[in-house]
Amino acid sequence: MKEKHWIIREDYDLETVEKLAASLGVDRIIATLLVERGVTTFEEARRFFRPGLDQVHDPFLMKGMKEAIARINEAIEKQERIMVYGDYDVDGTSAVALVYSYFKDLDRTIDFYIPDREREGYGISYQGIDYAKETGVKLVIALDCGIKATEEVQYAKQSGIDFIIGDHHLPGDEVPQAVAVLDPKQADCPYPYKELSGCGIGFKIVEAHLERKMGVRLCDLPEQLDEVRRARQEELKLKLLKYLDLVAVSIASDIVPIMGENRVLAFFGLRVLNTKPRPGIEAILKYGHVDRRKADAADQTDTAEKPKTGYFEKELTITDLVFLVGPRINAAGRIRSAFDSVRLMLTEDVNIARHLADDINNYNMERKELDTAATEEAKRRIEKDPFYRGRHSLVLYDPGWHRGVVGIVASRIVEAYYKPTIVFTKGSDDLITGSARSINEFDVHEALEKCADLLEHFGGHRCAAGVSLKQENMKAFVERFERLVQESSGGKEAVPEVEVDAELGFSQITPKFLRILKQFAPFGPENNVPVFVTRELVDTGNARVVGTNHLKLSAIPIAERTAPYPAIAFQMGEYISRVRKGERFDLCYQLEENYWRGKTEIQLNVKDIRFCE
């Protein structure tokens, strides 16, 4: 295992921490965690701990929203056929399900379309546009894709089909000539929050349309409204709340920041999931051993913002969505057809949901077999082929690898070697297609921009991107990409880092501390589960290796008279002999609730272990 560099965060003002701790009546560590997340005043802390739907931004601040809603209303008035188009991953399919279900509720003649990963690839395809033309579609709402589809949108325009683009990926130099392009990452877009998911963009379209229809805004403060408008706003909240479960699934699965507006949307989305989940999500969760409470059925929502929860035996978190829901929904688009994922999220029939969930879970098991085999082969090549020795990047190609798993394989290679990685396989139209995954220190999208002359298509984010190129350009691309990575690191090998929020003694882990810490949720990028360091620990003598090389131990401080805490250290079984010998160690960990057989206990999720000299 590659040695990690621990970085104790000190990027905060001590005076600000002390003032915040005093005003909130909390200890210094809690105040430090807040300041590290940009929460520096009592009012900011109130909004952080008590998210409200009035904290979302006015959707009409987004460039193009006014034009988008006008064109949608025109289509409704003229009874034109609308098609919702989306990417085949969780973000895209949840966005399609959200927008499609909203307009379907309005009794609109509407269709949806997801491109086939193998035949059409990522983004807006000519086949999809041809399908729209054949079925009489006049307006396409594209979600989680399209920001670079200039030629495809022009092709549709020639066929009398208008496009509304709703994307969150980085734009290129040229923006499609659509009726409206909704993407907060456009340089001239004044929308205050830039990190919405693709499904989040879809939600803002629905929010904007419903606000215009009802004559009240979600972001209006209730105390500033008269009684009639306040009642109308409560109705608006209830109408919109039912879509936020899909937004939460997309936020978790697409690994977007969970601060600002995303945190509000995820917070209420989780409330919906924990109160009255849609049949498809509940059916999928059964495969993660998350079951409905046996004693009592789901409580109904009392108000839009204060529902009674407790539908499942355990409270669903972002982590459950990341590991239990997202991979399964993704598997349909990776292995078979993402249409199944959309149908799963749309159906209100419990039996149909169960059948679809069965199929999707089978796809996921097949996906696991494929990505495990490809990952093992990729690692074997890296270890045995002299070409990879001393390289700062890893680019691998095998025409036999399944297109649906190359992104997962790239992620696993980054985890193992901590180097920017691109995994390629055979694509369509005689192209090589692949997925790039990066490390914290390297912007892979920026690097691909510097290789654009060698590429046919690329798009994505700082840490993940899709790319395709011609076979004859592969060698030149590999060498240029390697050079860019070397230049970025100054020729030094990147070292994985663990960012530590604070040092913590076990005696400081009080019920009040844990209660407040839990209120930091939902967790995710920019609001990660806090990482702590506790020093000078030993095991109580019951350490063992469980599962596939996971170290299970019970840690107790040498200097403190406190009870031990159970700890799990994934993929760290090689440390078992030293722990059993009674060697002292420092632990870098996250505090988490471990739910097992109806019981919940606090355990340490170990990020790294360092033995004392």
Can you annotate each of these PLM segments?
Residues 34, 87-89, 141, 167, ...:
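Divalent metal-coordination and catalytic microenvironments
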Residues 45-56, 80, 105-114, 184, ...:
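Gly-rich Lys/Arg/Thr-decorated short loops/hinges at beta-loop-alpha junctions or inter-strand turns
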Residues 384-411:
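Flexible, glycine/threonine-enriched loop-and-boundary segments that flank and lead into catalytic domains
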Residues 63-176, 181-187, 373, 377, ...:
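N-terminal small/polar loop signature for handling phosphorylated ligands or for N-terminal nucleophile
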Residues 99, 104, 109-110, 263-327, ...:
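Acidic, two-metal ion nucleic-acid-processing modules in DNA metabolism proteins
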Residues 134-137, 145, 150-334, 338-344, ...:
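Functional cores that coordinate and move charged inorganic groups
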Residues 422-438:
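Short glycine-cluster motifs
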Residues 1-78, 324-362:
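Cofactor-/ligand-binding subdomain signature composed of acidic, glycine-rich
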